[in-house]
Swiss-Prot record:
Biased composition (Low complexity): 191-210
Signal sequence, start to end: none
Stated name of the protein: Tandem C2 domains nuclear protein
PROSITE patterns the record matches: C2
SMART domains in the record: C2
Top-level taxonomy: Eukaryota, Metazoa, Chordata, Craniata, Vertebrata
Organism of derivation: Mus musculus
C2 domain sequence ranges: 222-341, 343-470
Phosphothreonine PTM positions: 213, 215
SUPFAM superfamilies, alphabetized: C2 domain (Calcium/lipid-binding domain, CaLB) (SSF49562)
Modified residues (Phosphoserine): 82, 155, 167, 173, 210, 217
Amino acid sequence: MAAEFIKSCCRGCLYGETEKQKFSVDRDFKASASSSQNTIGIPPLTSVLVKPQVGCNEDYLLSKLPCDGKEVQFVVPRFKLSYIQPRTQGIPSHLDELEGSARASFGDQKTELCSSFYHGPSYDVYNPCYMYQHFSPDLSRRFLPHCETKQLYGSVCDLRTSKLPGSSGLSKSMLDLTTSSQRFIQRHDSFSSVPSSSSSRKNSQGSNRSLDTITLSGDERDLGRLNVKLFYNSSAEQIWITVLQCRDISWPSSYGDTPTISIKGILTLSKPVHFKSSAKEGSNAIEFMETFVFAIKLQNLQAVRLAFKIQTQTPKKKTIGECSLSLRTLSTQEMEYSLEIIAPSKISVCQAELELGTCFQAVNSRIQLQILEAQYLPSSSTPLTLSFFVKVGMFSSGELIYKKKTRLLKASSGRVKWGETMIFPLIQTEKEIVFLIKLYSRSSVRRKHFVGQLWISEDSNNIEAVNQWKETITNPEKVVIKWHKLNPS
């Protein structure tokens, strides 16, 4: 019915305009003929001025008709509701442009599509920047329902996202940075890998096992602590190393109840200095109380590390644990350290350290990360020197937001100085901010080798990283610089 009505209206308008035009032409011709007796040099009819017609005339429409006289099918197009999402949501100026009815119909249609199309983590079907990704059932269980689908923020529009009315920018951003939760502490093998939850993992058969039910291996058990005391005598240029005691040490059950245990120390100079304590009978708290003195200049000591190896002498000589500390803070003031003993590594242990600077710029809503220097870097097995670079990834709620890297520089005497500054913008929706910093080496054959990594967050397993993050967040605009030992995994 609607199609026939519109068709008849179009025909009526077309033929009405044609008859009107013919009548006006006849009237002009009769008037000119009656006045031809008194007028000389009447111009032809074709030269009479006619008001230009707006739109299409009859001849144009008739020329488009088929030559065989077939009837042209007139089809009424189906109209659908459409809506173009503004670039910035939540601004009243954009919302006022929509009428109430259109806004209501859009909201109803959006709710219907969201509820019928996908029953998982919420996302915006009208967001033109959204890219659909398939989530396996296991991954959908790992992420909480309130996690929103995020994108890699790189455009100017994203970086200048406006705040909602009535929100306090500084207090809100500081709250997001400081209130991180344990449920999003995850491990990433690389920037492109899928994060694995710390609460459960899948074995090779695909079954989930809680960490509480997994038996810890020898590399994961707490192997005790070694207490030492350091002092530097500036007048005699001597370092005094006192091995105090070893507590809560564990050893293989095949070694019996009371094996004899000794401590071996190494000053990692260009020509290493070794020393060894006397053997003591194994117990829960082994008292050594032995002091070792070496005449070495302070500036040489502050560039090396002091490593310890815990060894059994009877019934079998074997290294059951090791630990180390940096002598950078060595001074004339006597300091006592409690070192955590870890399982001995079958490969060379990563001793690399990285100097980082952080600054929370609350006014500009961004975090400034400085990659300053690295030391104790591994040496090459070939005469050619290695080159090093650092990769930095910023995660929010377990998802990668930004990734950057430094330039490639050659090492000199086991040290590299970058002095580079990276800027990471923040927005209101980003929570549980975590930085993953990885150090890589590159050989002459362009092969990349992983050296070590460091997590900087409130829940990092590195105490220095936790302290630096807390000091950065609680003191905006202050640059906090600290050295960190990299973890090999």
